[in-house]
């Protein structure tokens, strides 16, 4: 399934996602604005267009302790937890936690990609995905865009070497930023081989499906479920 990660909430924009052949999306909010009611409103609209919607929260902080506290606070309130990266200690804290799903924009505001061999190993061990944020690339031009592409390539090389999950997102906030999933796939094909590009396109759904399973009422933890006995 093709699952995007974005902040789309208007009906006309959600309708466009359907027309562009997305199967669903993660609707994320920042931790300081998180509202379950807002997610439920988006979910109701999306389901009317037969789109699968998952709730997400993006945590933005420069404190490792605050990051851990917020992850603990939101883990059972939403499907996907993203951490806004850029600060090296935050990048590291994010990939050290099993409860974090995605490290977003690890290169943000940096002169390097934000990921090295050590962080790649940690991300692999804890199954924390690294995000390729397409909007950050489009919002740059000239040298800055070329440098961001270089960072993407570096992180993809490390991710493949250490078996780190990778996701790609449009991070769209309006209909003008929404992209066709086939365009994202074509973009990935310029960076990596086609089979790896296909794998990246499928990763967001796999993470969402795993978290959706863990949020079921009868699931204690992965592989442990409470089964109700049928009365004779």
Curated annotation (Swiss-Prot):
Q: What does this protein do?
A: Part of ribonuclease P, a protein complex that generates mature tRNA molecules by cleaving their 5'-ends.
Top EC class for this record: hydrolase
Q: What is its main location?
A: cytoplasm
> What EC number is given for this enzyme?
3.1.26.5
Could you tell me which cysteines form disulfide bridges? none
UniProtKB keywords: Cytoplasm, Endonuclease, Hydrolase, Nuclease, tRNA processing
Query: Any idea what this protein is called?
Result: Ribonuclease P protein component 3
What the entry lists under Gene3D superfamilies is as follows: Metal-dependent hydrolases (3.20.20.140)
One of its GO biological process terms is:
tRNA 5'-leader removal
Gene Ontology cellular component list: cytoplasm; ribonuclease P complex
